Amino acid sequence: MLLVVDVGNTNTVFGIFENGNKIPLFHKRTVTRKDRTSDELGLFFRGFLREFKIENEMITGGIYSSVVPTLNPILDRMFQDWFKIEAIRVHYQMKLPFSISYPRPYEIGADRLVNAATCAIDFPGKSIIIDLGTATTFCVVNEKPEYLGGVIAPGLKVSMDALTRNTSQLPPIVFQSPGKILGDSTIESIQAGFFFGWIGLLEGIIREIKKDKGQDYQVIGTGGLVTVIDAAHPGIFDKIDPLLTLRGLQILHLMNS
């Protein structure tokens, strides 16, 4: 069995793959804690695995992507001590299913490399990959496949938290469509601003990318809020895959083990 871990600034998502299946047997999302020790992580993962009757020795491979560099040695130690394996860490110099047309490839986040890997294998052709995470990232991969670059915008939750934190009378809200552009209350007005504002951001950046690179790019969405946006405002994404990052980790493990 393969344990894959995607460490983001806000959340960590992990899952178990078995026998080369493209869909994880199990997966879970938890808050990223930057103060955890390797033993605390080991205990956490052991508890998760035992929920599904999986013992540590059944894990024969491990890979992780991380945008929190301070956690990298802790993850390495956790895999070594608790699973007796050397985990693969995603980086731009590993074997990738695409080439990189980027003057400073070392600046590309591990999460973006993983997402591009899934698109190169599972969604061949010209793709715009949008990941709605702590940051909202757009990555562009052409038909060769070649990583061309991307766009990084603020994340939705970060922006919502900033508005609440920096104002005295605006309450926190749940992100959802208010159903109309003009709100009848403060909460509805904030919801309208974030919902339609984010729709405009997504559609506007997609439009500019297609204007620059061509109209025949498919748009693939992933991340925690992708299903919410797709259900309330269909048509932005040609395909959505909330587990796209975990699948990318599986692909890169197969290529590099």
Swiss-Prot record:
Tell me a GO cellular component.
cytoplasm
Q: Provide the cofactor list for this protein.
A: NH4(+); K(+)
Reactions it catalyzes: (R)-pantothenate + ATP = (R)-4'-phosphopantothenate + ADP + H(+)
Keyword Lipoprotein tagged: no
**What keywords does the record list, in alphabetical order?**
ATP-binding, Coenzyme A biosynthesis, Cytoplasm, Kinase, Metal-binding, Nucleotide-binding, Potassium, Transferase
Q: Which residues make up the binding site for K(+)?
A: 131
Q: Where does ATP bind?
A: 6-13, 134
Q: In which pathway does it act?
A: Cofactor biosynthesis; coenzyme A biosynthesis; CoA from (R)-pantothenate: step 1/5
Positions that bind substrate = 102, 109-112, 186
| Compartments, record wording | Cytoplasm
Please give the biological process terms from Gene Ontology that the record holds.
Answer: coenzyme A biosynthetic process
Which EC numbers characterise this protein's activity in its record?
Answer: 2.7.1.33
Q: Which residues form the active site?
A: 111
Gene Ontology molecular-function annotations: ATP binding; metal ion binding; pantothenate kinase activity
Name the domain of life: Bacteria
Q: What does this protein do?
A: Catalyzes the phosphorylation of pantothenate (Pan), the first step in CoA biosynthesis.
Per the record, the similarity remark reads: Belongs to the type III pantothenate kinase family.
Q: How does it assemble?
A: Homodimer.
Protein's recorded name: Type III pantothenate kinase
